[in-house]
Regions:
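Domain-level signature for soluble enzymes in the chorismate/prephenate branch of the shikimate pathway
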Residues: 1-262
């Protein structure tokens, strides 16, 4: 049975994504994204699942950096998960009894209007499922968690309300990561590039893709910690094949790495 590492407690959205990407796998929660990636790199798991972009909150930059920092890791797939947030309490609780809600800061932001309408105190936690586990363990009828329905099922919470997120069209995209030397196959790719420090270098790099009919889907810049004020760019591409991708990267030059084909 394959094992999949993710950040959070059982029932977290990353756990939901892991179960969708690798059906039948054993999923293992870790305390941070860094710890999940390190576990995969060390051979403690066969895969890792990392969130990389939320439709409301935007990208998760750290998880692109982790792919660069762990050269043996490659993207092997992706999935997009609809995010339904639930108000989860203990047995006997109701919306009327709640005075405080707990969850990850991103989840709390995504239910901001709902929470403000009830004038609840808000407390941040490290992950959504961890908040559910915490309130069930403590058994406070006045405290609820914001999290996925799976977390309520696993930890014995009671769903008091469903679909409480402010935006109905709320999705998170996840990468499936494996430890392998092979870049992979597929018509999508993610690459990391550090362009030269000269005028027009980023424009020229992006043109190298466009000139070969490679579609740019996503671009994020992150500081290169080794060189002050130098940036590394993570680029997600579509309509990719081996020859055209290799030709584009040859034109771009500099420090670069294919982080995965999928």
């Amino acid at each position: 049975m394959p094992t999949v590492a993710y950040q959070g407690h059982a029932g977290a959205f990353s756990d939901v994504a892991a179960r969708a990407l690798v059906p039948g796998a054993e999923t293992r929660g870790y305390g941070s994204f860094d710890a999940a990636a390190a576990a995969l790199d060390a051979g403690e798991a066969d895969y890792a699942v990392l969130p990389v972009e939320n439709a409301i909150a935007g990208p998760v930059p750290r998880n692109y950096e982790l792919l660069w920092e762990h050269p043996a890791l490659r993207i092997r797939g992706e999935t997009t998960l609809p995010i339904e947030l639930c108000l989860i309490g203990t047995a006997g609780a109701s919306e009327a009894t709640i005075r405080e809600i707990r969850s990850h800061p991103v989840a709390l932001e995504q239910v901001r209007r709902y929470a403000e309408a009830h004038d609840w105190q808000q407390t941040t936690t490290t992950d959504t499922a961890g908040a559910v586990r915490e309130i069930v363990t403590q058994g406070y009828p006045t405290v609820a968690a914001i999290g996925p329905a799976l977390a309520a099922d696993i930890h014995g919470g009671t769903i008091l309300a469903r679909g409480i997120q402010d935006e109905a069209e709320n999705y998170t995209r996840f990468f499936l990561i494996a430890r392998t030397d092979e870049a992979g196959a597929g018509n999508r790719a993610c690459v990391g590039i550090a362009v030269n420090d000269r005028p027009g270098s980023l424009r020229d790099a992006l043109s190298a893709f466009a000139d070969r009919d490679i579609d740019l889907r996503f671009l994020i810049a992150r500081p290169d910690r080794r060189v002050p004020f130098r940036y590394r760019f993570f680029v997600e591409l579509a309509n990719v094949d081996d020859a055209r991708l290799a030709a584009a990267l040859a034109v771009i030059g500099g420090e670069q790495r294919i982080l995965g084909r999928y």
